[in-house]
């Protein structure tokens, strides 16, 4: 089945660490730590947890020079590329560049005078570090606030182009741009305007989207709209929640649009009085148990025969509820074995894990060592 994205926007290619960004590269998932950066152990543990779930890039706030020293210790203990989030003090950018940061998230306009901006850009150039220009509707320049009275797509665009012009004048093109807002329509319209004006990679997201539920909904709509139009090269789902949830929602959005698949896509009915087993409890438990599986798979769990067969025929593994025991399908073929409804969770987990192992084995590339001439 084809994805919903047509004519993905063409952009320049940059690299954040070893992760390619733009120019047709896979859309990268990013999250951000919410620990105190000076708490090295907690920050490292959170970064590693995000990486295990599939985060391609992790952003870390570095608000002080002391935090920059701790960033060095953090960088030494993780493998995933790190973005340092820096504002106001240009010296922090110079310091983390020496410590191996993979990207600087700054606004050139709030780093200081032209000499300081040049110092940061020259440092980034010397260390082959890209920059992300991050425009946010909540922190626009005062003169633009006075000019427009309220955030609009036009003011976010003007702010972005102002920052981009600074880098252009310094002959620096290794950067990506974001124009975020907490209002979904404002963010979407701003990104559309920006995408029509520049060919740099775009980092997309709905900033300060809210809690786990409402934030996920806003992000799915906003990010989904942009991705469906071919706009976006990296993304972050910003939630007032555990950053782990950000990565989960991000991959759910990408899976829903069939842009990038990772892990299990659960297809489950909302249940009614026809269900023959506890569908909701089964899905909830399996989602937790099978978080470690990265193999793309479609798993249908339907409580009765009304839609169960149709979904099972299109799934890697499907179960259709029946009285006392349920029908089991693999790759659309009904199996002789049936699941006892009392033990359906354990039985499904075993079958799904076995299927994942088989798919992984089939997808392995056989390396043939040719004899040396």
Swiss-Prot record:
Enzyme Commission code(s) on record: 1.17.7.3
Comment on bound cofactor: Binds 1 [4Fe-4S] cluster.
Gene that this sequence comes from: ispG
Descriptive protein name: 4-hydroxy-3-methylbut-2-en-1-yl diphosphate synthase (flavodoxin)
Pathway: Isoprenoid biosynthesis; isopentenyl diphosphate biosynthesis via DXP pathway; isopentenyl diphosphate from 1-deoxy-D-xylulose 5-phosphate: step 5/6
GO MF term set: 4 iron, 4 sulfur cluster binding; 4-hydroxy-3-methylbut-2-en-1-yl diphosphate synthase activity (ferredoxin); 4-hydroxy-3-methylbut-2-enyl-diphosphate synthase activity (flavodoxin); iron ion binding
Reaction(s) this enzyme catalyzes, per UniProt: (2E)-4-hydroxy-3-methylbut-2-enyl diphosphate + oxidized [flavodoxin] + H2O + 2 H(+) = 2-C-methyl-D-erythritol 2,4-cyclic diphosphate + reduced [flavodoxin]
Gene3D superfamilies in alphabetical order: Dihydropteroate synthase-like, Sulfite Reductase Hemoprotein, domain 1
Pfam families associated with the record: GcpE
Co-factor(s): [4Fe-4S] cluster
Species whose genome carries this gene: Baumannia cicadellinicola subsp. Homalodisca coagulata
GO BP term, example: terpenoid biosynthetic process
Signal sequence, renumbered to the chain: none
Keyword ATP-binding part of the UniProt annotation: no
